[in-house]
């Protein structure tokens, strides 16, 4: 069988590995060498960075030159190769190698065949991306090359440079006929075919391919070649874990191939392989290498990077199964077999893009030498390392006996190994080979574990496009050896897993087809090498990496499904969690390393005791923390009780304040009622006062008039008396004179009679003029009487109106009626007197002479009457002026009333506004109460959640304690068991070789137990994952609580804003309160002034009452005097009618007029007083309303201020409660974080203990598996030959090394 890779170029810059595959169809270079028997088609160039020599391996020769393949073998035509699609991830295709580049010798087995007409069968690409075999008439079973030429498997002699074909003839195995057949498919990333092979001038024909038995293998995509008989597939998973994070490179699916896994599926299949081990070098004569150096050396020397090495890997396992000791090895190198899942099968280092590689080869075509890829960089002086000698592999000499091998396996991995000189190596190689050849037939055949399944199905995909390869992972985990997950160190680990599924077409009898997953175990018979701790550490680190990646993926999925964060945020969280885990594991790494390096030393007991003491201390610390948490819970409960008591006290205070406000409101209402009553009484007193004042004024006017009349009457009586006395004296004298003059008159009468006759005419004229004057006077008197009558009638009407309006005016009306009656009587009397006067006038006409003397008096009386009329007119004018002034005062009062009404409207509006404000404040208070209730409910929920979290944490802590104790017990038991078994095995190996089989049986039993315990550990890991999920849920709940607290802080800000608004409103209300206080002060000053005026009026009322009583007494006395005077006047009128009648009539007329005027003025005054009283009542009512409103406003403002203070206190208390809750929450979060850290530490310790257990259990297994294996001192590359190849090591290989 021959690999056909086209022209493949691959450069690994990071570790100096150059891989180049060349086939026979390429043109020969200019300076190419002729094809030799030792030429090759695959060249791996390893450039050591740490100072190691580079090694060139050739593993292309698969059969001897003289043994051609059968002619009827199947082949791949060029059309099939042209039909193969490119890898979609590589956008560019590798260019064809120019003659300058390809300086490698060609494959000698590629020969052109003349058989063109022969019928062939071809492989075509099916619908599902599967190569299908079509109509080939001949289906001949194939025999493998090494079966056809068994001398290829014989050991190689480096001295003679040839294969010892006669020493060993390996038997053929029927399994090999079924296992390795005519075609295999290898899947490998970063490889690509050229676009068109048919366009190449030197491409081989189908006959050539048929002749050379060459098989084309797709490396770009996952291809499954289907066979109706059997089928296998090749899957390569490459994974790399860097120090900074997890960098993944997924294989891209092939076009038109549903069976190829997607990138997400591939990433998941990568992560779920815990059985992968990296190959780490072991220093036999010194300490363990640091991370960087060992990483570089192991990656640069052990990991095969070519596609042929991949294919070789599968066939290596098969060959190891058939002939484990017949493989050609170098004597001075330690050998570790290529087991699947050991990390040495595939290189996982970073590979640059194809374009960069092409540019690099194009730039320096002439400098590509055979030995190294280019100019070596200068080594950092810190990284310089002394190269190891190849003589240190066998410290006890190269003897070919069992004693040497047992001693070597006993002291393998220890620092006390002896180093050999280079001169001791080559002379003894043949001896070692002979020894090996002698003992090789005695080794039993290798055990194969092949899991035959049904037809390989494509991997299922979920909604997110992730591949669910649970079945495959379980099968691989069951077949492959289960490896522990060790502590992760600060170094870069490269992991490669390969699951190779072969296809067999040769066997036609078997009808079932299935995927074969091969895991090979070699059980040598002679010696068993002991596994070193650093190798086991490398294995642990690799499985730890995969476990950590699976845990990371699980955490990422949980966080992504449960939370709403971005992918970056979730990745950061996962990385932070694993960084904490790494720090905890790095702390515990020292103790684990000590236990791994010296498993048989007594320091393990001390380390376990130290760990036990540490665990006891941690348990005590956790108990102390739990006690502190309980104390904190008790304190929180006490604070809650205190808060409840404070709330109850506040409620009681609130109720008491409400009751006090109710009592104060009742008192206010009572005081307002009393004030109203007192104001009504004051109003009545003022009304009575005004009435008394009016009555007093009337009486004063009447008294003044009476005094005037009395004065006038007194004066007139005195004058009349004096005049009468004088008249009497004169009458006496006249009588005397008359007696004297009688005589003289008689004398004169005679003379005068004469004169009388003369004068009669003159007297007649004078009497007529006098009569006319009297008529005029009569007419005037009649007119005045009529006016008086009309005024009397009007007065009666007004008196009736006044009587209907008020009872008080009835008395005055009765008095007026009496006065009217008196006046009527007096008028009647005056009329009688007028009649009498007329009679007297007739008499006066007779007595003209007597009247002449009286005329002068009458004229004087007339003048007096005129003067009185003028005075009355002036009094009328004065009364009109007073009326005008009263109207002006009335208008002013009306204006004041309007202003008072306006003020009342304003006050009512302000009252309405204040009521609205009060309602708003009440609503705000209710809102604050609701918020407070909500806060209390939220606090209650928070307390509940905190209690739940504490309970869960306590449960987790108890579970961790119990698990740690159980694991410690199990560790002790396992350690004792392992020590006993190791002692027994060593004694049995030294004494008898037959007891090895018993030990193997015991190891198999131990493996079963280990599997059971691993299942238990997996269950425990699942429980831990469930605990992690619970913890994540708790963290999510904590985040929700944080969001709720943030929302509450926003509500708090809103409350602060509302409080600020309320404070602004309160400031405004305070300003208004100050203004109203100033107004209230002004009103209080007005009230005091009004009260003073009231007191003054009361004193005046008392004085006026006293004066009224005095006046009434005077009135009574004056009425008596009037009666007396009237009687005297009547008496005097009777005596002096002639002189007195005119005056009395005039006086009566004047009195009537004055009375009429007084009555009119009294009416006007009464109306004005009524209007003034009404206005004053209104003003008083307004003042009372203003006072009441002012009092109510002051009370309301006081209540509002008290409420605001209470609300402020409540808000402050709520803020304090929120702060307390936040502080308690922070404390709980800190405690949770501390407990999480403690749990993580415990989990790390548990993991370390589990890993120690796994290492100890695997140590016995490694002893069984590594009997015949040689480990290279410098971690050099392994040289193995696949089943269908023979690799003779000639002089060219020695020169290249």
Curated annotation (Swiss-Prot):
Residues 1-550 are annotated as: Head. It comes from Mus musculus (Mouse). Residues 604-1251 form a coiled coil. Residues 367-378 have a biased composition (Basic residues). Residues 297-306 have a biased composition (Low complexity). The head region is responsible for both junction and actin filament-based distribution. The modification Phosphoserine is found at residues 113, 203, 257, 284, 298-299, 389, 392, 482, 678, 704. InterPro entries: Myosin_tail (IPR002928). One of its GO terms (cellular component) is actin cytoskeleton. The lineage of its organism: Eukaryota, Metazoa, Chordata, Craniata, Vertebrata. Its main location: other. This is Cingulin-like protein 1. Homodimer or oligomer. Interacts with CD2AP and SH3BP1; probably part of a complex at cell junctions.
């Amino acid at each position: 069988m021959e690999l056909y890779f086209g022209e493949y170029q691959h450069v690994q810059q990071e570790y100096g590995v150059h891989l180049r595959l060349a086939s026979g169809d390429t043109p020969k270079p200019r300076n190419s060498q002729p094809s030799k028997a030792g030429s090759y088609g695959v060249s791996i160039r390893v450039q050591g960075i740490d100072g190691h020599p580079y090694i060139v391996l050739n593993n292309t020769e698969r059969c001897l030159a003289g043994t051609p393949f059968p002619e009827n073998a199947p082949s791949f035509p060029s059309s099939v190769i042209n039909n193969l699609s490119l890898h979609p991830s590589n956008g560019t295709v590798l260019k064809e190698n120019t003659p300058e580049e390809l300086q490698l010798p060609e494959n000698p087995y590629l020969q052109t065949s003349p058989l063109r007409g022969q019928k062939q069968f071809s492989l075509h690409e099916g619908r599902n991306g599967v190569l299908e075999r079509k109509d080939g008439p001949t289906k001949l079973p194939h025999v493998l090359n090494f079966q056809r030429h068994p001398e290829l498997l014989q050991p190689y002699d480096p001295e003679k440079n040839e294969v010892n074909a006669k020493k060993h003839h390996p038997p053929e195995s029927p399994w090999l006929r079924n296992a390795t057949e005519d075609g295999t498919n290898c899947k490998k990333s970063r490889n690509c075919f050229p676009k068109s092979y048919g366009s190449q001038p030197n491409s081989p024909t189908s006959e050539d391919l048929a002749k050379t038995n060459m098989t084309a293998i797709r490396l770009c995509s996952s291809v499954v070649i289907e066979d109706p008989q059997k089928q296998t597939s090749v899957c390569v998973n490459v994974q790399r874990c860097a120090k900074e994070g997890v960098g993944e490179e997924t294989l891209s699916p092939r076009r038109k191939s549903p069976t190829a896994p997607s990138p997400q599926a591939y990433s998941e299949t990568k992560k779920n392989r815990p059985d992968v081990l990296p190959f780490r070098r072991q220093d036999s004569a010194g300490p363990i290498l640091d991370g960087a150096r060992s990483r570089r050396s192991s990656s640069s020397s052990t990991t095969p990077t070519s596609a042929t090495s991949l294919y070789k890997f599968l066939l290596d396992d098969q060959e190891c199964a058939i002939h484990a000791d017949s493989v050609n090895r170098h004597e001075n190198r330690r050998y570790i077999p290529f087991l699947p899942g050991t990390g040495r099968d595939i290189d996982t280092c970073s590979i640059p893009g194809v374009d960069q590689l092409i540019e690099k080869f194009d730039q320096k075509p002439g400098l590509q030498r055979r030995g190294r890829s280019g100019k070596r960089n200068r080594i950092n002086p810190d990284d310089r390392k002394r190269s190891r000698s190849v003589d240190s592999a066998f410290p006890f000499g190269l003897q070919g006996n069992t004693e040497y091998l047992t001693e070597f396996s006993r002291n393998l991995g220890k620092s006390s190994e002896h180093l050999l000189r280079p001169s001791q190596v080559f002379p003894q190689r043949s001896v070692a080979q002979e020894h090996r050849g002698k003992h090789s037939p005695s080794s039993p055949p290798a055990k194969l574990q092949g899991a035959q399944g049904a037809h390989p199905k494509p991997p299922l995909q979920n909604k997110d496009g992730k591949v669910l390869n649970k079945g495959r992972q379980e099968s691989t985990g069951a077949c492959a050896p289960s490896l522990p997950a060790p502590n992760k160190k600060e170094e870069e680990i490269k992991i490669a897993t390969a699951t190779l599924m072969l296809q067999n077409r040769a066997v036609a009898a078997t009808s079932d087809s299935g995927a074969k997953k091969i895991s090979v175990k070699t059980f040598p018979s002679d010696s068993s090498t002991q596994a070193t701790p650093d190798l086991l550490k490398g294995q642990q680190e690799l499985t730890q990496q995969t476990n950590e990646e699976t845990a990371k993926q699980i955490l990422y999925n949980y966080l992504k499904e449960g939370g709403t964060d971005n992918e970056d945020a979730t990745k950061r969280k996962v990385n932070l969690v694993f960084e904490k885990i790494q720090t905890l594991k790095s702390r515990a790494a020292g103790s684990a390393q000590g236990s791994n390096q010296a498993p048989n030393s007594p320091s393990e007991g001390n380390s376990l005791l130290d760990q036990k003491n540490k665990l006891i201390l941690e348990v005590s610390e956790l108990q102390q923390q739990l006690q502190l948490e309980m104390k904190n819970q008790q304190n929180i409960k006490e604070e809650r009780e205190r808060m409840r008591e404070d709330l109850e006290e506040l409620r009681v205070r609130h109720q008491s304040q409400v009751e006090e406000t109710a009592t104060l409101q009742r008192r206010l209402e009572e005081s307002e009622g009393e004030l109203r009553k007192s104001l009504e009484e004051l109003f009545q007193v003022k009304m009575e006062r005004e009435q008394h004042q009016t009555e007093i004024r009337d009486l004063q006017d009447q008294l003044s008039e009476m005094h005037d009349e009395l004065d006038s009457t007194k004066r007139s009586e005195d004058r009349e008396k004096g005049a009468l006395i004088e008249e009497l004296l004169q009458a006496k004298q006249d009588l005397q004179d008359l007696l004297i003059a009688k005589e003289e008159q008689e004398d004169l009468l005679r003379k005068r009679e004469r004169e009388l006759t003369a004068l009669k005419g003159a007297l007649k004229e004078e009497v007529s003029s006098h009569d006319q004057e009297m008529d005029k006077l009569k007419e005037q008197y009649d007119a005045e009487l009529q006016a008086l009558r009309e005024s009397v009638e009007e007065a009666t009407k007004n008196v009736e109106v006044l009587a209907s309006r008020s009872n008080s005016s009835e008395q005055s009306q009765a008095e007026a009626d009496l006065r009217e009656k008196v006046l009527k009587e007096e008028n009647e009397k005056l009329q009688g007197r007028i009649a009498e006067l007329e009679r007297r006038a007739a008499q006066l006409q007779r007595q003209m002479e007597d009247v002449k003397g009286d005329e002068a008096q009458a004229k004087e009386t007339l003048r007096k009457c005129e003067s009185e009329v003028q005075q009355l007119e002036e009094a009328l004018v004065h009364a009109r002026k007073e009326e005008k002034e009263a109207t002006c005062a009335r208008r002013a009062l009306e204006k004041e009333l309007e202003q008072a009404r306006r003020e009342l409207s304003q006050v009512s509006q302000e009252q309405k506004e204040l009521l609205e404000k009060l309602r708003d404040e009440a609503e705000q208070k209710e809102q604050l109460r609701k918020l407070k209730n909500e806060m209390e409910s939220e606090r209650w929920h928070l307390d509940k959640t905190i209690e739940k979290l504490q309970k869960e944490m306590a449960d987790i802590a108890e579970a961790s304690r119990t698990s740690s104790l159980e694991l410690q017990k199990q560790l002790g038991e396992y350690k004792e068991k392992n020590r006993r078994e190791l002692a027994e095995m060593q004694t049995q190996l030294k004494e008898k070789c037959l007891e090895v089989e018993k030990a193997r049986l015991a190891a198999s039993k131990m493996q079963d137990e280990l599997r059971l315990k691993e299942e238990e550990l997996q269950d425990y890991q699942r429980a831990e994952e469930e605990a992690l999920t619970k913890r994540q849920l708790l963290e999510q709940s904590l985040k929700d609580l944080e969001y709720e607290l943030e929302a509450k802080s926003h509500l708090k800000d809103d409350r602060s804003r509302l409080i600020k608004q309320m404070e602004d409103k309160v400031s405004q209300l305070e300003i208004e309160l100050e203004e109203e206080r100033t107004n209230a002060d002004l009103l209080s000053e007005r009230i005091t002034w009004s009260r003073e005026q009231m007191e003054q009026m009361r004193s005046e009322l008392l004085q006026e009452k006293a004066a009224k009583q005095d006046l009434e007494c005077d009135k009574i006395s004056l009425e008596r005097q009037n009666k007396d005077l009237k009687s005297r006047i009547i008496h005097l009128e009777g005596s002096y009618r002639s002189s007195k009648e005119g005056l009395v009539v005039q006086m009566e007329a004047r009195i009537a007029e004055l009375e009429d005027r007084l009555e009119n003025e009294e009416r006007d005054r009464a109306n004005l007083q009524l209007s003034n009283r009404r206005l004053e009542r209104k003003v008083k009512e307004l003042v009372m309303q203003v006072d009441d409103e002012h009092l109510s406003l002051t009370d309301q403002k006081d209540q509002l201020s008290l409420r605001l203070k209470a609300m402020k206190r409540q808000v402050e208390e709520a803020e304090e409660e929120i702060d307390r809750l936040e502080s308690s929450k922070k404390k709980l979060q800190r405690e949770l974080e501390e407990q999480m850290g403690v749990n993580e530490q415990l989990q790390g310790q548990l993991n370390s203990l589990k890993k120690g257990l796994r290492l100890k259990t695997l140590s016995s297994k490694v002893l069984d598996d590594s009997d015949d294996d040689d480990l290279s001192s410098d971690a050099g590359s392994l040289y193995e030959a696949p089943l269908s190849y023979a690799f003779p090591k000639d002089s060219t290989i020695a020169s290249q090394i």
